[in-house]
Amino acid sequence: MSSKQATSPFACTADGEEAMTQDLTSREKEEGSDQHPASHLPLHPIMHNKPHSEELPTLVSTIQQDADWDSVLSSQQRMESENNKLCSLYSFRNTSTSPHKPDEGSREREIMNSVTFGTPERRKGSLADVVDTLKQKKLEEMTRTEQEDSSCMEKLLSKDWKEKMERLNTSELLGEIKGTPESLAEKERQLSTMITQLISLREQLLAAHDEQKKLAASQIEKQRQQMDLARQQQEQIARQQQQLLQQQHKINLLQQQIQVQGHMPPLMIPIFPHDQRTLAAAAAAQQGFLFPPGITYKPGDNYPVQFIPSTMAAAAASGLSPLQLQKGHVSHPQINPRLKGISDRFGRNLDPSEHGGGHSYNHRQIEQLYAAQLASMQVSPGAKMPSTPQPPNSAGAVSPTGIKNEKRGTSPVTQVKDETTAQPLNLSSRPKTAEPVKSPTSPTQNLFPASKTSPVNLPNKSSIPSPIGGSLGRGSSLDILSSLNSPALFGDQDTVMKAIQEARKMREQIQREQQQQPHGVDGKLSSMNNMGLSNCRTEKERTRFENLGPQLTGKSSEDGKLGPGVIDLTRPEDAEGSKAMNGSAAKLQQYYCWPTGGATVAEARVYRDARGRASSEPHIKRPMNAFMVWAKDERRKILQAFPDMHNSNISKILGSRWKSMSNQEKQPYYEEQARLSKIHLEKYPNYKYKPRPKRTCIVDGKKLRIGEYKQLMRSRRQEMRQFFTVGQQPQMPITTGTGVVYPGAITMATTTPSPQMTSDCSSTSASPEPSLPVIQSTYGMKMDGASLAGNDMINGEDEMEAYDDYEDDPKSDYSSENEAPEPVSAN
């Protein structure tokens, strides 16, 4: 019974507690927002930490000791809520799928039993304990949140405090600045001065920077302009130099062709004033060398004479021959500056009275005319000269360009030109051979007249061949003369080019005429063969002479093909090639073989053997050294003053003068040497100097030096001259500055015996017919008989060449960038 009595109050109490807890839960729902979130925390971890047997008794004892009912109610309410949560938690754990451990189950049962069957004191004590723990947790959470809030506040306040401290510092600074009004004014003044100084400094820096920019830009612009100007000047200079070189080259080439084809030597051609009578006379003389009967010309007319230098005159005149101005049948040849020397050598005065002329001239008159022409040569080109004074003791007035020779009126023949051309550059005044006139219309004419008369006397039908042909109109001659009359000839290139074009037209007409007469060379060749073969001493010489026929006519046994050593000079490139091969400017002309009449120009050939090198390798001239640059002009001056002076004497004078010159005087010539060497190196980068071997001549089986050979040839020529010209005044052939003789016919002096045809020492023409010269080289050739170079040493050019080759004068192997065809040009 006791057990039942003991359990009944517990049950009643439990029912009362359940009702109380229900009431508390309803209140909690009403006061839901007032409860702290921490009160809803589960209590099972706290209750697990304490022994279950002690929880309820302590809770009951705590409730009994608490006198405040409100606190008890609040604690009970919390306890009930916690118990409800605990029961729900246990129910959740019981309904979970995970199996429960046996101890946990027993433990939970004990807790439930203790909770269900504990006394109220125990329950109150446990509630108080729970409240304490909750308070402790709340405090901990509050402290944690306060710490977090304090850290955030510190972060926020740190900025505020910094600003406050900065304000404080500035206020302190302002407090320091604050002072007496004088100090403030002084400080303000200092600040204003500093500000103005800084502003001025900034402006100065900006201005200096701008100036530097402008200066740099201006300097760059100036440099660019200077570079552009220098480049333009260099280009212009290069173009001008190239044009000058091309023009000089063309003029030289045309001059050579014109001189050769037009039979015109480079004379000092007088330019007559614009007088129709004079022009008509010149045109008539150009075509026939005779005045028509209706035109009169007074030789005593005084007119200013204007001289053209020989190099330009030959290119401009393009084949004009000396004006043979005649009145009726009176000849008017042009005087030669070396007439005195020629007359001395022949022991005769140039006295036309031998032919019945009305005028006689002694040596004094010739000297005066010679001096007058020398003086005229000193005048600059294009300058006007007054008329030359007449000799005081002359019977009649004399033209300043020549001596008037008269012939017998009863003579049925015409007077042949008795002159040598005015060549101030001829380096030697050797006696010229007599050459009669031969008509191109009678190529097979007998060379030896039956009568013992003068070789200048020929039948009436023989006339001097006109260089431009009789069919050339009178208008072209007048045009050329009028173009030559221009005083600005040398300042106007158009005039020169016009004259050159006229010369080309003449050349084309000459070619057409020669093509219409193809039998001319055959006739000349037959006459030459008759003459040469009859004089050949040995069979070897006869065979060699016979072999010259196909070569001279341009015909070959191999279907017109020429050998490797034959060059066609009608093509400009071949002419240039031969110019480069021949070692010196003087030698270029000596290899030209131009037929004077009958044959076509296409038959002009060069026959030459290579000199110590392969035949295909052209000869490259050495660049001129400083001495040669200086001597070129000095030699020209000496020749103008002394045309008869020999080249060896001129070279000795130049050598002594060069040695006496100071280095300062030589400096510009060394600079020119460096420039020429640079040009030569650019043009021939692989050039290597190969000196030419010394030549010796084999005559009659003996080796002779050049001096001995020249003496032997001189004596033999003198013998032949005396044999053929006994009692006769020799006729002078027309010679050019190129060293090639172009007479109108074959002379007696060139019909020498066979050595002339077989001379291996001749470097120029050695043919009886000078219009068809044969070039032979001395290298690799032998000779059986004596040799006589007919025209070899007649011309002064050959003397110079011999001196160049054998007396160590280096001029012959030197070249300049603007070489003239002549060895030494007068202008």
Curated annotation (Swiss-Prot):
Q: Where is the composition biased (Polar residues)?
A: 1-10, 421-431, 439-461
Q: Where in the cell is it found?
A: Nucleus; Cytoplasm
What positions does the DNA-binding region cover?
Answer: 620-688
Keywords of this protein's UniProt record, alphabetized? Activator, Coiled coil, Cytoplasm, Developmental protein, Differentiation, DNA-binding, Isopeptide bond, Nucleus, Phosphoprotein, Repressor, Transcription, Transcription regulation, Ubl conjugation
Q: Which SMART domains match?
A: HMG
**Do you know what upregulates this one?**
Expression is dependent on SOX9.
Q: What start-end ranges are recorded for coiled-coil regions in this protein?
A: 184-262
- The protein depicted here goes by the name Transcription factor SOX-6
* Species this protein is from: Mus musculus
